[in-house]
A protein has these predicted regions:
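Cysteine-centric segments in proteins
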Residues: 1-75
Length: 75
């Protein structure tokens, strides 16, 4: 799912996600761990109480939001 992301990048390439927008108003997220592979940078975020994976694709420099398999709501 395409998503708009407001973030900053550190000198080491790490991302700090501030908020995301999915066709509605901007929503603040809590950020977890992140990693990079040959295809993308991956960042775990908490959105509406559910953990999602934000993916910045290296080939298009676009963000995608993915639900994690077996993802559950946190209370």
């Amino acid at each position: 799912m395409p998503v708009e992301v407001d973030c900053t990048f550190g000198a080491d390439g790490r991302v700090r996600v501030r908020r995301v927008r999915l066709g509605r108003p901007w929503r603040v997220v809590e950020q977890g761990r992140q990693w990079a592979d040959a295809d993308a940078r991956h960042v775990l975020v908490m959105l509406d109480g559910t953990v999602h994976e934000l993916v910045l694709r290296a080939d298009t420099l676009t963000w995608e939001l993915r639900e994690l398999p077996g993802g559950r709501k946190m209370v």
